[in-house]
Regions:
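Metal-dependent phosphoester/phosphodiester hydrolase catalytic core
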Residues: 1-470
Length: 470
């Protein structure tokens, strides 16, 4: 399309045939933002189904389905939403997205790793056009390749999406402006990563359903926010990447260049990136437990505390990218945890638990992505009492990670499957929430069947998930 801007027309109707058009307008798609369209439509009725489409000259988009949230004073009978994360284009087909579209949820929650910046693996079913995305052009091409997938298109057409990000939209295990290659070349690497992150953030904005008003000066995006579904539910969309402190106890990466065998060995061992760290390691413990370390940043923490204090929702749902309850590994004498998740930020994790208790938040459910496995967890406080439920979705398509050998040491884990890709389908009513772990049989087969591995119920007022019999 070149460097010229284009006026893109949009229409909103009450029916998919567009016999009853209720709003129309145009949006200037600008070249410097890849001709992306972020139209915001005012005056729609709450709690309604609508349909929308776009036109540019003789070209017309497919019809998308949208739903508006119920009014703040309404008490809807039910909310149906799907939860997904981690879609690696090379590792598998996106059949899970197609099944998600077939389910016709009210919302899809995308918890990060919508794209992957890097290609890897032996059993790739298709190839990226470039192995590693580094520049703005690279990231734009990556999103374009993803957006051509018909199953992903079907999921976007099916319903609205509520989105956050994790690390692979930018770089594995990055923390704010610190990459997992920090130290591999000194200030030049830091400067290069700042540019890479800015390019990745811009491409993410261009390709995801977020408001233009979320753009911030200095190449940032205010991603976090909340959404009320009437009185039934409040969603808290968290940003666990842009403002976090560096990972604790990272292996030293002080070598002059990463392009050496010693440098590559350190990177493989986790230099600068997430790794298993000892909870009682005297060399690590002071940094790990430093109360100034943050996952969300001070401003986002203040916003979240205020949003929690004002909530009158029946269900309080946290959409965020990294595991919260955590998994103990290592040995009983020398326990370890993964440094990239919330357990690697124990003071920040405790502040969130304290806020839940202080504001008496009703029915908190933490929805997480990242580990390429299903989990249903009790979230326990320091006294061992269950205070929330965490549900972690597996990958849409990526190599799965089985943690079943760790279960005897982690009684808070009520369910785990690390052998399937898929998603979670939830339905919330005032009295209960049901979560179905929907698995696809083989992500490398585009016609693979699906099944429900397990269903769990959370009764309002309880933080004990209960498995339902088939």
């Amino acid at each position: 399309l070149g460097l010229v801007g284009f006026e893109v027309d949009w229409e909103v109707a009450e029916d998919p045939a567009f016999a009853r058009i209720i709003a129309r307008g145009s949006y200037l798609a600008r070249a410097h933002l890849a001709h992306s369209v972020h139209a915001e439509v005012a005056g729609l009725a709450p709690g309604r189904e609508y349909f929308y489409r776009f036109r540019l000259g003789p070209y017309e988009s497919p019809v998308g389905r949208a739903l508006t949230a119920p009014a703040a004073t309404d008490s809807p009978a039910a909310l149906r939403y799907a939860v997904c994360s981690c879609a690696h284009y090379e590792q598998g087909f996106f059949s899970a997205y197609r099944y998600m579209a077939d389910d016709r949820p009210d919302l899809i929650l995308e918890l990060g790793d919508y794209i992957y910046e890097s290609g890897y693996g032996e059993r790739r079913v298709r190839l990226f056009d470039k192995r590693e995305a580094v520049t703005l052009t690279d990231f734009r091409h990556r999103y374009a390749q993803y957006k051509l997938d018909p199953d992903l298109q079907a999921a976007h057409e099916a319903c609205p999406w509520l989105v956050t990000w994790d690390d692979h939209e930018v770089s594995n295990d990055y923390a704010a402006l610190v990459s997992s290659h920090e130290g591999c070349g000194g200030p030049a690497v830091r400067d290069a990563f700042v540019s890479l992150r800015a390019a990745a953030y811009q491409a993410w904005y261009e390709n995801m359903p977020v408001r233009e008003s979320r753009l911030r000066a200095g190449a940032g995006i205010q991603l976090y926010g909340d959404l009320d579904w009437g009185r039934l539910a409040r969603f808290y969309v968290l940003d666990t990447r842009q403002y976090r402190s560096p990972l604790a106890c990272a292996l030293p990466a002080t070598f002059a260049t990463c392009d050496t065998e010693a440098g590559r060995a350190l990177l493989r061992a986790g230099a600068g990136g997430g790794r298993q760290i000892g909870l009682n390691d005297p060399a690590c413990k002071p940094e790990l437990e430093d109360p100034s370390r943050t996952m969300l940043g001070a401003e986002q923490e203040r916003w979240l505390d205020g949003a929690l204090s004002s909530s009158r929702a029946r269900w309080n749902l946290f959409a965020q990218g990294t595991p919260f309850a955590g998994i103990l590994e290592g040995t009983p004498e020398a326990p370890t945890t993964f440094s990239d998740g919330w357990p690697g930020y124990p003071a920040a994790r405790q502040r969130l638990l304290d806020a839940l208790a202080r504001h008496r938040v009703a029915n908190p459910v933490i929805l997480s992505g990242d580990p390429h496995a299903f989990f249903v967890n009790e979230v326990r406080n320091a006294r061992g009492a269950s205070v929330a439920v965490e549900m972690i979705t597996t990958s849409i398509a990526n190599n799965n990670k089985d943690k079943s050998k760790t279960l005897p040491r982690n009684p808070h884990i009520r369910f785990h499957d690390g052998t399937h890709s898929g998603y979670i389908l939830c339905e919330a009513t005032p009295g209960r929430m049901q979560a179905d772990m929907v698995a696809i049989e083989d992500m490398r087969d585009p016609r693979t069947p699906r099944s429900v591995l397990a269903s769990y119920e959370i009764v309002a007022g309880s933080s004990q998930p209960r498995r339902l019999e088939p």
